[in-house]
Amino acid sequence: MSIIQDAIAWIRDEITPQGRQWEEFYRNRWQHDKVVRSTHGVNCTGGCTWNIHVKDGIVTWEMQGLDYPLLEAGLPPYEPRGCQRGISFSWYLYSPLRVKYPYIRGALLDLWREARANHADPVAAWTSLVENPAARQRWQRARGKGGLRRTDWNTALEIISASMVSTIKKHGPDRIAGFSPIPAMSMISFASGARLMQLIGGASLSFYDWYCDLPTASPETWGEQTDVQESADWYHAKMLVSMGANIGMTRTPDCHFLAEGRHNGTKLWVFSPDFSMVAKYADEWVAVNTGQDGAWWMAVNHVLLTEFHHQKQTPYFMDYTKKFTDAPFLVEIKPAANGRVRPGQLLRAGRLQQYAKVEHGEWKFLMWDEADQKPKMPMGSSGDRWGTEKGKWNLLLKDGQDGSEIKPQLSFLEDHDAVVQVELDDFGAGGVCTRGVPVKTLTTANGKQVQVTTAYDLLMAQYGVNRGLPGEYPADYNDPNAPYTPAWSEKYTGIGRDVLIRFAREWGTTAEHTEGKCTILIGAGVNHWYHANLMYRAGIHALMFCGCIGKNGGGLAHYVGQEKLAPAEPWAAIAQAKDWFSPSRLQNAPSWHYVHSDQWRYEKDFTDYHTVPQNAGPDTTAKGHTMDMQVRAVRQGWLPFYPQFPENPLDVAKQARAAGADSPEKVASWVAKRLQNKEMKFSVEDPD
């Protein structure tokens, strides 16, 4: 009976209006009069679609969109997509801390009001402040101490405009530089500021490299900028490695592909010094010491080359290496300063008699043709990219001069004229090791003889793969003193050699059976280290040796700010004011800050910090100071730098006109001649 009475009481509570007033509050909380589609534009690559529920123009709540199209049959759906940062985005919109108005340093605002009271012209008012040492120090010393006051837009815009005009008149337009993060975050916002910079003659600073999101290994290796695969491709991989990429945190919308890939048979290795969010997804978590991923991969590559390229020549790997890498290219072996020999440059095609007259012969390279037993010049080098004859900038294994087929010979191990002891750098120990390398001798067009080997043979020697040649090669994997053996890696990585060997064999076997379905997920955890490019390239080697790049389920996947602009060309015309003039004034931000902030004063020569190549020739770039290299880069035209000259460039142009230079070409020639005669210098030569 009591149960029935309790039930009746409960029903009475449910239908009593007074007891259900809380429901009205709940309904009001989720009310909306429309739903709009949007995303959270906070420089996030995810770009997740969200349904934004709006009432009276106010965001009331948000819900993830669930209508992504399927990319292809067999792939899991894209949703769910979203993250904790996104779903709380409306908090930023309505936060009392959000800056909605211009703020100005109080000390500067007081000075500005005084100056405007005394000067009708805003430019004159600003000039009176900036040229008054006491006034200038007053607002500069207030920096970092708070004291910001809200002001109106007209005042803010007037100060900005007056300061820019004053700077241009006194010092020149290239004394003004503008910076904004990635344009893909907001193309219109970025373009408006960048266009202003270009139209007034200012410089636009780079962004991707400045905050260390650009993986320099990508342009160094492939000449592109983070053209990585779609994250759904993780599902195709049969072995995934995550290093320096905390996928659960930084790619939350995509991390479900990790879990789904494992259901599909993918094995996930995570290299992380701590048990990170992504480590919970791992089949194997390897706590590699911080900053030592490069040592891990170098030892892995030693195993891969030993077992999958030398002891067993895996057909797929060998074919891929011949077709898609520079391993078959011929490299000169040249005398070093100490009388020994060291690897030189790639042998230029133009140095041989048969190719002496080809266009851009200094920018075309050679392979050894296994069938004809002679050097041949494959298409696809830089010289073909800029040649007058089109259609040769490709990877077809054909001679660029006569069109004959090329069967690249990777190694001279079984067919050589001599074995020479080549000096190779051991940067870990700060010394050198001497190892035997098979070479052939060629006669150049001028009658000189030159010894050459293949890049592949040099790789084998550098990695210490014992192929029965004389020299300082390791006896086996357990040699702790020979660079790049599994035993050598232990003192850097903190991981036992048995784990590394097992990983390398799994990697190679997986790639062999799947034809390259091994992927490295990599990110800021590695990229923000000094020499990150070398850690990246060590991993890239493992991908190359096993034919993983360019394959579905394989490759290097760098996920830090790799957003791209879809309308890149038309957008650039607007943002860089190309509809008015070209070229634009663009400056790499790291150099700009390094020089102008006097960071260079706090550094010493390269050799005080780093192990550099031993016995390098007189033209080496591995000696000196970074600032010396920066000056050299500007003087030789490798890098732009602004401001260009100590003088106002407007005054320089006037002087050139007065000297009779009556066209832009003559002005440029006049300036170049004065630079050559040391009558002018670049501002980077005297940054203060």
Put a short name on every predicted segment.
Residues 1-449, 457-468, 484-487, 539, ...:
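N-terminal export/assembly segments and adjacent metallocofactor-ligating motifs
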Residues 665-668, 673-682, 687-688:
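Ordered core of a single globular domain
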Residues 179-186, 246, 487-492, 522-529, ...:
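Conserved short loop/turn motifs at secondary-structure junctions
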Residues 169-173, 186-187, 490-523, 534-540, ...:
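Gly/Pro-rich turn-and-neighbor structural signature
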Residues 267, 274, 292, 478-481, ...:
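Secondary-structure capping and boundary motifs in well-ordered enzyme cores
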